[in-house]
A protein has these predicted regions:
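N-terminal capping/lid subdomain adjacent to the active-site entrance of alpha/beta enzymes
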Residues: 1-80, 85-94, 98-102, 224-228
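Residues at structural and domain junctions
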Residues: 22, 37, 53-56, 109, ...
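Generic enzyme active-site microenvironment
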Residues: 52, 81-82, 107-108, 132-134, ...
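Short, small-residue-enriched loops and turns at beta-alpha junctions
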Residues: 56-62, 84-92, 109-117, 137-140, ...
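Shared catalytic-loop signature of beta/alpha-barrel
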Residues: 98, 104, 115-228
Length: 228
């Protein structure tokens, strides 16, 4: 459950036209790691047993330090996922896969273009850990092509993260579930993307693996009710 400050958002959006903007990622790596650790501790203290952080806005070596910093403060029962937001081309994706493998992440999310199933399959062939993707696939046919050609396997505990509100709602999500059942994809490996009440209701109602939450982000859509 990683989030960016306003300054970090501006810095990662691009500094070509804003040469005076200094990214805290680049100039204060230790401060960034400490801030990230503090944020993750807050989520753990709130009861979360899995947290997620972003990578890809910095050089690989600095991202490795950030991942190591977060892993170092997680208790034995907690897990970490890492999200690249579809940023990488082939060379970067493979390099990050090799760097992240020793960390034993719960999953490495969206390492490449969501429709580049050939590259995703190549990453799956060399990455020793679960992958996740699917939030940018908006049709049942796209998700079926993902499981056919993307190299993902239930035996690896790979995760599919379709975003129901963006993928034609609950009725179409139910049809996607039927398709995945035909491919023998277990429901505990489905985590609806979105961090919203629809995704939470779908995860609970269909008996899925879980749903994302964005505590402290997106105003009234942040997090979930205390009884959830």
């Amino acid at each position: 459950a990683d989030s960016l400050t306003e300054e970090e958002t501006r810095a990662n959006r691009g500094t070509v036209t804003e040469p005076g903007v200094a990214s805290p990622f680049r100039n204060r790596p230790m401060e960034e790691s400490l801030r990230l650790q503090d944020e993750m501790r807050r989520h753990l203290d709130a009861g979360y047993t899995m947290v997620k952080m972003k990578v890809g806005g910095l050089p690989l070596a600095e991202d490795a330090q950030r991942v190591e910093a977060v892993k170092s403060i997680l208790p034995s029962h907690a897990e970490l996922a890492v999200d690249a937001n579809c940023k990488f081309g082939r060379d970067e994706a493979l390099a990050y896969a090799k760097m992240l493998a020793p960390f034993k992440l719960r999953w490495f999310e969206e390492p490449c273009d969501p429709l580049d199933f050939a590259l995703l399959a190549e990453i799956a062939s060399i990455y020793d850990g679960p992958l996740s993707t699917g939030e940018d696939l908006f049709s049942t046919a796209d998700v079926e092509n993902l499981v056919r050609f993307g190299g993902l396997k239930p035996a690896r505990r790979d995760v599919i993260q379709v975003d129901p509100p963006q993928a034609y709602g609950i009725a179409q999500y139910a049809r996607t579930l039927d398709m995945l059942a035909r491919h023998q994809w277990p429901r505990d490996l489905l985590f609806p993307h979105g961090g919203n009440q629809m995704s939470l209701a779908i995860a609970a109602g269909f008996g899925l693996g879980g749903a994302e939450s964005y505590p402290g982000v997106f105003g009234p859509f942040a997090g979930f009710a205390e009884e959830a």
